[in-house]
From Swiss-Prot:
Gene3D superfamilies registered for this protein in UniProt: Bira Bifunctional Protein, Domain 2, Serine-tRNA synthetase, tRNA binding domain
Subcellular location: Cytoplasm
Record protein name field: Serine--tRNA ligase
Binding-site list for ATP: R267, S268, E269, E354, I355, S356, S357
Any Gene Ontology biological process: selenocysteine biosynthetic process
InterPro entries: aa-tRNA-synt_IIb, aa-tRNA-synth_II, aa-tRNA-synth_II/BPL/LPL, Ser-tRNA-ligase_type_1, Ser-tRNA-synth_1_N, SerRS_1_N_sf, SerRS_core, tRNA-bd_arm
HAMAP family in UniProt: Ser_tRNA_synth_type1
Residues that bind L-serine: T236, S237, E238, E290, S390
Length: 432
């Protein structure tokens, strides 16, 4: 959520920046609501003051023997007017909050202006795509060939489309990938491993910016009672990890806080009908190792470079070719002010596909969550800056390994860094 004071004082500048990312801020509507808010707040304060004055005069009138009935009637009428004004103000503040909760973050000045992914800027490349002397298979055929290790047909029977059943060596490889990532981030990159709930409440989804804008993209449980609140399956462990800081005040010497977790993620993919219908690329349920950092306000861009580098290290150790992209204004996520995507090479598609997205949210999420730290110089509380990134998406990493490490006979060579997690197995092969 953007700073309300900033919007009041620099609404036109905010509108110009938001326009760059394809969001049109209704300046007239916001200005009108703010004018009405100020008027109502003044009216409420005036009524409160007048009521206090009249209430005090009742005691004096009573002490002097005057008839206090007229004063009591006046105080009662003022009380009714005050309650009505407060109710109207509360409704107006809710309307303003609903508006501001749906406004995306402002793009940083270093972000290139553009409409969509076609205008993202390539920053760098690592590795050289392998040249094959045989016909390349995609991960669906390769996975099926390893003892039916990727079984989409059974998953469709169990649940529906965009799910998978993994078995045998493919399931073990999938687990090995996640374990390797967690070990790397905790042992070399300084993150604390966390185990978090896969179901979260509305406040958590609101805190990280999934709600209210993307409420239709989540899977929800029904409340246990009419009064109870339904829960949502996490679309990413960014939600529970970041919300750990909600309503907290940290000492500066506790920062940065770096957390990582391996969880399933659940997304309805409401806006992707017909896209990536084959295979693991776009699933309703998928595993991801997430990285989250909570830092001081002046450290977040430095932290973004570090966090992105942590994700890159995974790809480098797996020896998977990738490119680093700086997202343009029109392709960034709702809460991000700057984002780097890492795209891994997929031979069967003959292109790079996103495998990690690393974003600096500035204080956008922290303001929603009231996640703060105490500045040691001023002793005042300041909003944290939050960052998150995939380190990596496990399923897409499995896809990349299957396709990049495939052999002519359909077998898969296991990347060297994963072999200890596979009990020394170096090759998994197709059943003949």
């Amino acid at each position: 959520m953007l700073d309300a004071k900033y919007l009041r004082n620099d609404i036109n500048i905010a509108a110009q920046k938001l326009e760059k990312r394809g969001y049109t801020l209704d300046v007239a509507q916001f200005t009108a609501l703010e004018e009405k808010r100020k008027s109502l707040q003044m009216r409420t304060q005036e009524l409160q003051n007048e009521r206090n004055v009249r209430s005090k005069s009742i005691g004096k009138a009573k002490a002097s023997g005057q008839d206090i009935e007229p004063l009591l009637a006046q105080v009662g009428q003022l009380g009714d007017e005050l309650n009505a004004a407060k109710a109207e103000l509360t409704g107006l503040l809710d309307e303003i909050q609903t508006l501001t909760l749906n406004i995306p973050n402002l793009p940083d000045d270093s972000v290139p202006e553009g409409k969509d992914e076609d205008e993202n800027v390539e920053v760098s490349r690592w590795g050289t795509p392998r040249e094959f002397d045989f016909e390349v298979k995609d991960h669906v055929d390769l996975g099926a060939g390893v003892a039916n290790g990727l079984d989409f047909e059974t998953a469709t029977k169990l649940t529906g489309s965009r799910f998978v059943v993994m078995r045998g060596q493919i399931a073990r490889l999938n687990r090995a990938i996640a374990q390797f990532m967690l070990d790397l981030h905790t042992e070399q990159h300084g993150y604390q491993e966390m185990y978090v709930p896969y179901l979260v409440n509305e406040e958590s989804m609101l805190g990280t910016g999934q709600f209210p804008k993307f409420v239709g993209d989540a899977f929800h449980t029904k409340p246990a009672t009419e009064e109870g609140q339904g829960l949502s399956l996490i679309p990413t462990s960014e939600v529970p990890l970041t919300n750990i800081a909600r309503d907290c005040i940290f000492a500066a010497n506790e920062l940065p806080i770096k957390m990582t977790a391996h969880t399933p993620c659940f997304r309805s993919e409401a806006g992707s009908y017909g896209r990536d219908t084959r295979g693991l690329i776009r699933q309703h349920q998928f595993d991801k190792v997430e990285m989250v950092q909570l830092v001081e306000a002046d450290k977040s861009f430095e932290a973004l470079d570090e966090l992105t580098g942590n994700a890159e290290k995974v790809l480098q150790l797996l020896e998977l070719p990738y490119r680093k992209m700086l997202l343009c204004t029109g392709d960034m996520g709702f809460g991000a002010c700057k984002t780097f995507d890492l795209e891994v090479w997929l031979p069967a598609q003959d292109t790079y596909r996103e495998i990690s997205s690393c974003s600096n949210m500035l204080d956008f999420q922290a303001r929603r969550m009231q996640a703060r730290y105490r500045d040691p110089q001023t002793n005042k509380t300041e909003l944290l800056h939050t960052l998150n990134g995939s380190g990596l998406a496990v399923g897409r990493t499995l896809v990349a390994i299957l396709e990049n490490y495939q052999q002519a006979d359909g077998s898969i060579t296991i990347p060297e860094v994963l072999q200890p997690y596979m009990n020394g197995v170096t090759v998994i092969g197709a059943v003949k």
